[in-house]
Curated annotation (Swiss-Prot):
Catalyzes the methyl esterification of L-isoaspartyl residues in peptides and proteins that result from spontaneous decomposition of normal L-aspartyl and L-asparaginyl residues. It plays a role in the repair and/or degradation of damaged proteins. It comes from Methanoregula boonei (strain DSM 21154 / JCM 14090 / 6A8). Pfam families: PCMT. GO terms for biological process: methylation; protein modification process; protein repair. The keyword Electron transport does not apply. This is Protein-L-isoaspartate O-methyltransferase. PANTHER family: PROTEIN-L-ISOASPARTATE O-METHYLTRANSFERASE, PROTEIN-L-ISOASPARTATE(D-ASPARTATE) O-METHYLTRANSFERASE. Gene3D superfamilies: Vaccinia Virus protein VP39 (3.40.50.150).
């Protein structure tokens, strides 16, 4: 993903005003947000607003998160270049494309087949070759590639799904919105051997995480 994409000035303003301007400091996260073309992950006519700080529809009753939240959750995950990362809720693939620039391998799970197919196409279009898109119930995680140095959940769960904590590597981090259907808190869970430390960051509003260990459909 080294080719400069159109609308680079809009991305730079997005980063300066909406992301760095709101306290995101990790230079790798800022660089990834400035480089990945968000408009390619949003269908028309909504792509015209791709660099506004707002969630937008991507079809199938799903949304793409606002840029600030993508940057915040990525910074909280703190992926390193050698890391293996699991994302739950691929959506259109934008968050995975950001993670692909920051980690060695990204596995992203999407419940809806049509959405997963679009994510694959979008990720291929931006050359994110280190991302694998899996169709299935993300609340089970993906044991075949576990353990993960980082797990990022992009839908709201009533509680942290147990399979995800089990697939987290020692010293790994899990970032997930936890709460009711209307409002949640971003929770960061860190593993230290058999112990886990949990921190609540700030209030958010995400679509529900549907699955065995999430919400019923």
């Amino acid at each position: 993903m080294t080719t400069p994409y159109p609308r680079s000035d809009e991305r730079r303003r997005m980063v300066d005003l909406q992301i760095a301007g709101r306290g995101i400091r990790d230079p790798r996260v800022l660089a990834a947000m400035a480089e990945v073309p968000r408009h390619l992950f949003i269908p028309p006519p909504y792509d015209r607003d791709a660099y506004a700080d707002t969630p937008l529809p991507i079809g199938n009753d799903q949304t793409i998160s606002q840029p600030y939240i993508v940057a915040l959750m990525t910074e909280l995950l703190h992926p390193c270049p050698e890391d293996r990362v699991l994302e739950i809720g691929a959506g259109s693939g934008y968050q995975a494309a950001i993670l692909a620039r920051l980690a060695a391998k990204v596995v992203t799970i999407e419940r809806l087949g049509a959405v997963a197919a679009q994510a694959r196409a979008n990720l291929a279009a931006v050359g994110a070759e280190n991302v694998e898109v899996i169709e299935g119930d993300g609340t089970f995680g993906y044991p075949l590639s576990a353990p993960y140095d980082g797990i990022l959940v992009t839908a709201a769960s009533p509680e942290i799904p147990q399979p995800l904590t089990e697939q987290l590597a020692d010293k790994g981090r899990l970032v997930v919105p936890v709460g009711g259907r209307a409002m949640q808190d971003i929770v960061v869970l860190e593993r230290d051997g058999s112990r886990y430390r949990e921190e609540r960051i700030e209030g958010v509003r995400f679509v529900p995480l549907i699955g065995k260990y999430g919400w019923e459909n």
